[in-house]
Amino acid sequence: MKLSYQGIQDKQGYAAAQVALPQYDWAKMAEKTAEKPVWVHFGAGNIFRGFIAGLQQRLLNAGLADFGIVAAETFDYDIIDKIYVPHDSMTLMVSLKADGSTQKEVIASIAKGIKANCADEAQWQQLADVFTAPSLQMASFTITEKGYALRNMKGELMPVVVSDMENGPKQAHHAMAVVAAMLYARYQAGAMPIAMVSMDNCSHNGEKLRASVMEIVAAWVKNGLVPADFEAYVNDEARVSFPWSMIDKITPRPAEIIEKQLMDAGFEDMQPVITSRNTYIAPFVNAEVPQYLVVEDRFPNGRPALDKAGVYLCDRKTVNDTERMKVTTCLNPLHTALAVYGCLLGYTSIAAEMKDAELVKLVKTIGYKEGLPVVTDPGIISPKAFIDEVVGQRLPNPFIPDTPQRIATDTSQKVGIRFGETIKSYMTSDTLNPADLTAIPLALAGWIRYLIGVDDNGAPMNVSPDPMLATLQAALAGVTLGQPDSVDGKLEGILGNASIFGVSLYTAGLADKVTADVKELLAGP
C-alpha cells in the first residue's frame, strides 16, 4: 500500500491494516483551498503533522469545513520535497497508547506544502498568493522557540537578520523576515486583517512572534524599504493580532518499531529520511494520545471552528494560567525530578523510571502534595485531572522514547520556574510554610548531586548541556561521592543565587534541607 491520494483509494487494504481514512475527498479539498485559502501554517514538521493538522481533519470529517491547511516551510525545504510531495501532503498518524496498542489514521487535511524560499520564484509567489487572499484568516506557527530568535547568544543580530533588514521584503531568508514579507504582501493587497498564531511550546509565544516581526518591520521602515503605514498596520491588533497559546503533546522522532509494524502491515516507503538540515522525519508520525491546545480568541478576520475540534478558546489570562499550571506544577517539575534522578540511577527511559516505586512517590509528592495546594487553576482544565493523566498515562507510556538525559538539558534555566514558583507561593501563603516541603528540596539536591558528573555507582556520567555548567561545576570542584563533608562551604553561592531558583533558598529557609539532602546523596549508594 502507498500513502498518497491514489493509494488511499485502496479502501480494502487500508481497512485490513486497521487504518482510518479521511471522510472527505482530498483532491476536492485541495482545489477549494487553492481557490480560497483560510489557514496557512509555518513549520511543516512532526508536531504540525501529528497534532495541528489532525484538528482540521476533525472539522473536515464532520463537515464543519471544506478547506485544508497550506503548510509553509522556512527552514528545511527537503521536508516538502521528500515527505510532502511524494505523499500528496498526507501523513500516516500513529497514536501510541499507554497500554501498548496503537491507533492509525491517514491525516489528509494539508492541501499542499510550500517552500518559503525567496530564491524559488514560483514557490515564493504561491505563498504570496495565499497571503493576499481576502479569505485568509490565520497563520499559525510551530517553528520552535529558536525560530523566533533574531540574536545569537551574545545578543548580537545574526548575519542573516542583518542582511534581511538591509535588503527588504523581496530578499527575506530568516523565518521572521519571511513572515514580515508576507504581511507586506497582504498590506499591499488591501491591508486585510489576519491572526498570527504562535503554537510553539514557550511562554508568551505570541509576544515573541510579534516582537521579532515588529523589529524586522521597523528596520525596513528605517531603511526606507517599506512605508511607515505598513508598520502601523502590523502594530494594529485590530487588523493583525498575535494571540498567545499553550500547546502540550509529546511527538517523538519516528520510532523503528512503528516503522516495522507499518511495513509488516503492507505499507511501502515508510522509511524515515534525514534531511540536509538534519531533520529526522518519516511519512508517518508517532505521538502520544493526550493533547492540549489553548488559544487566545483574537481573530480579526474570523477563524476556523477550532472549538469544535477540541481546542480551548479563551482570553489571554486563561492561556497564561494554563501554561503556568503545566510548567510550574503539573508536568514540568515532575519531568525535571525524573530527569536528574534518572541520569544518576542509569535510566535511559522516563517510562522505565515510572516502574521505580521511590521515583513514582517522589513525583507524586511534588505534584499532588506540594504543587496542588498552590497551583494556578485556569478554570478550563482541572489541575488534578491533568496530573492524574501525566502520572497514570503519559510518563509511564513505554512507546514514548523520552530520555532523562534530554530533559536534563539546561536545567539551570528551568529550576526557577519549575520549582522556584511553588517555593515563592509557599513563602507568600498565610497557611503554608516552605519548611514543610520535602520532595522539592530533594529534587533540587538531586540536581546538584547530578552536576558532579558521577552516577550512583561511582562511574563517570555525561552531564547534559547547560549554559551555567562550567560555573556550577567550578563551584562544586572537589565534591566527591562517598565523602559527604566534601560539599562543606561549596553550596552557598549556588543555593543563595536567586537568578537560578527565583529566590534565595536561604531566604526561603530551605538551604539547610537541600544541603542535608545533598550530603545524604553523596554518602554513596
Report the location of each language-model feature.
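Substrate/ligand-engaging "lid" and interaction regions
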Residues: M1-F42, N46-P525
